[in-house]
């Protein structure tokens, strides 16, 4: 990969990989990605694009995704965050897995070693036959 920092706090990254197929009937997987992000002590913003060829080593099963991220530090103990993803497959081969996902939440730093992050997530499938899914989580981090 290649990482550029054209100005302070701005990061641009381009990278890729190739996973060789082990079976003669399979096709190798190529992953290509680009990322741009800005981060300072008050907030961060980022966007990413990913493209994968031959998903699960199957010829022509290409897919791509766009993601955006944001965090805002309200103070030293509280921050809010969000993420949005759009996933799609070439020629609709994975229509059940295509769609949009979103997440919003808050992180609370409780003392020096504990963080709690309640968050809400939604999955909105592209196919109209499946209803949206909604989830509520409470993530906890304990460190020493």
Residue spans for each PLM region:
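C-terminal hydrophobic structural anchor segments
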Residues: 71-124
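Surface-exposed beta-strand edges and their flanking turn/coil or helix-capping segments
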Residues: 26-28, 59-61, 94-96, 119, ...
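Detector for outer-membrane/organellar transmembrane beta-barrel domains
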Residues: 3-91
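Transmembrane beta-barrel architecture of outer-membrane proteins
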Residues: 29-31, 63-65, 99-103, 133-135
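Outer-membrane beta-barrel "beta-signal"
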Residues: 108-109, 132-144
């Amino acid at each position: 990969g290649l990482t550029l920092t054209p100005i302070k706090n701005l990061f641009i990254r381009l990278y890729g990989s190739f996973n060789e197929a082990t079976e003669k009937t399979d096709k190798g997987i190529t992953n290509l990605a680009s990322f741009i992000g800005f981060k300072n002590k008050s907030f961060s913003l980022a966007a990413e694009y990913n493209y994968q060829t031959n998903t699960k080593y199957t010829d022509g099963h290409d897919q791509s995704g766009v993601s955006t991220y944001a965090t805002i530090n309200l103070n030293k103990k509280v921050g809010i965050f969000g993420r949005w993803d759009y996933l799609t497959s070439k020629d609709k081969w994975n229509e059940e897995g295509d769609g949009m996902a979103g997440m919003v939440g808050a992180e609370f730093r409780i003392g020096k070693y504990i963080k709690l992050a309640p968050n809400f997530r939604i999955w909105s499938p592209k196919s109209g036959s499946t209803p949206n899914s909604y989830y509520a989580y409470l993530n906890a981090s304990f460190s020493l």
